[in-house]
Amino acid sequence: MLPSKIVRHKAGRFVPVLLAGLILAACSGQGPKSQSVDIQAPVTNNSAYYLQQVQQSSDDSKTDWQLLAIRALLKEGKYPQAAQAIGELPNQLSDKQQQELLLLKAQSLVAQQKIADAQPILSQVKTSELSQDQLARYYGLQIASAQGKTSLALLRAYIAQEPLLKGDERQQNIDATWQALTQLSQQDMNSLVINADENILQGWLDLLTAWHANAQDANMLKSAIKDWQTRYPDNPAAKTLPTQLSQVQNFTKASTSTIALLLPLNGQAQMFASAIQKGFNDAKNGTLATAPQATPGSAQDPIAINQQQPADANAVVSPSANPAAAQQSGTAQQPATTQQQPQQQPAAEPASNAQVKVYDTSSQPIAQVMQQAQQDGATLVVGPLLKNNVETVANSQTPLNVLALNEPEQIQNHPNMCYFALSPEDEARDAAHHIWDQGKRQPLLLVPRNGLGDRVTAAFTKEWQSLGGGTVLQQRFGSVSELKQGINSGAGISMSGTPVVMPSSSQPQSVSVAGLNIPAPQTSAPAASSGGAIDAAYIVSTQDELQLIKPMISMRTGSRSNVALYASSRSAQAGAGPDFRLEMEGLQFSDIPLLSGANPALMQQAAKSFNNDYSLVRLYAMGIDAWTLSNHFNQMRQVPGFSLDGNTGKLSATADCVINRKLTWNQYRQGNIVPAS
């Protein structure tokens, strides 16, 4: 028999082993422990991962995984799958889960442009129960719901979201806040009523006021921004300026001591070039006629001579230019009675000592002309005029600053290049804005069946959709003889058309608003409209064509049609009699300010110089504005929101420094031409 103490020793060693085995057995019986789920945190994985977690979960966390999977599906633009997943959620949700579901439903609707359905859902969200990440998403949805329309609610959403963001997202918020502010007109500013404790919003509005007051002088704007930063040190923009305004800090004025003016002095475009050159020189020498203000009844008839669009793609791009236009003798045409209101005088630079040398681009290759201009010490190039030459210069990587007088087919963003053209595309973009601003949402384009119609259609549609518009319809027409056959047969023109289908590359692939990524839903091509919904028609035609098109529209729609009619300057002519003006009753048309009464004295001077050929007057005005733009080259490139009241329109620049022209819109009313209302 073994000693008792030996037995006790062996038993003592056995007990811990037995306990460990029991513990391990108990743990294995419980199964793997579930991962913790936080539905209020950011989504960091793709939808496949979260859907897998849903399949593997059987406890209370399954619903949380479902909600995360829905967020991931929405982030990836998989809206049908997200909708199906929402339908599979249990009816009973916790308060936290219910708030997350409201955000997900709203996001799905906003992404599918169902804003009216999303807004009441957002109103149910209890912001006090949201995490910081959820709050950022909530305000992002409020911002996206605004669809780019600036309002106090939108500004407040940006301001509320800003402290919830970091890094690039925060800078994007500041930039977007500033962009929204710059959309406010002075009338909008005057109508804003904010609370006394909204110091951040007040600071933003004061920054906008400082910008408006000093935008035309970069140095004054620098000083105004610095003063504003001192007065509002706690404003987020005081610590990190909007990107556009930060560029002002590095602004330096471009040298214009020696300007090279590149024009074709021979060939078909010579007449155009001469008009531009005269306008440029008259502006440089300070010999432009001026008047204190345009007064009611004193404005020239805002109409232009009948011209055909150049067929050559390299021709001068002018909305109504024709190198073979017949010259009219005598002094300026006596205008029809107008009722223009006083307008601001276009900007005019004083006489300058700058040296201007003209180079003939029709006598040698443009590359040689540019090289010669550089060797001659040019600090700024104005031109060339022909499109193929502009494309060559854009591809040449020249070190010189260039104000091209045309646009290439594909705009290239160069820090030393701007593009200024009188093009039908430019008019079409302006028309899209004008029609949109008048509250129209279902436009029809009536354009010729040729390349001009293609260009106008593409430009209008792209701009329209950038404003938030939907489908644009188009209807093509043929020659005058075809239109006459139509009117003689009583066919008329119906307010219907086929949808304009833009290349897929031009369609937005996603929308990123204040840190919230909302992919654009995939949509099929819209079906043709049968009419009835159209509320506006933009007509690009000559006057002869318009005289047939408008009555043909009335034949089908009646004289009391609610469709508003708009026309480009192509259909406006000098000398249109009272019968024509009465026939055009109600139609609105665009033209440059110089032909719309902005400066009657200069208009008379120009009309006399060009024998009342208003197509050349337009190019003369272009030359004047080219001089003004050359003296503000770096402002156009670097100072956000910089604009000029030019003779060809209110001039501003895109991010690629394409000069946009906001035109003057007039209307035929009871035989008179009046400002469009």
UniProtKB/Swiss-Prot annotation:
GO terms for molecular function: enzyme regulator activity. Residues 309-359 are annotated as: Disordered. It is found in: Cell outer membrane. The keyword Membrane applies. The keyword Lipoprotein applies. GO terms for cellular component: periplasmic side of cell outer membrane. It holds the Pfam family LppC. A lipid is attached at C27 (N-palmitoyl cysteine). It is a lipid-anchor. One of its GO terms (biological process) is regulation of cell shape. A lipid is attached at C27 (S-diacylglycerol cysteine). Residues 313-355 have a biased composition (Low complexity). Residues 1-26 form the signal peptide. Its main location: membrane. HAMAP family: LpoA. Regulator of peptidoglycan synthesis that is essential for the function of penicillin-binding protein 1A (PBP1a). Interacts with PBP1a. Belongs to the LpoA family. This is Penicillin-binding protein activator LpoA. It comes from Pantoea ananatis (strain LMG 20103). The gene is lpoA.
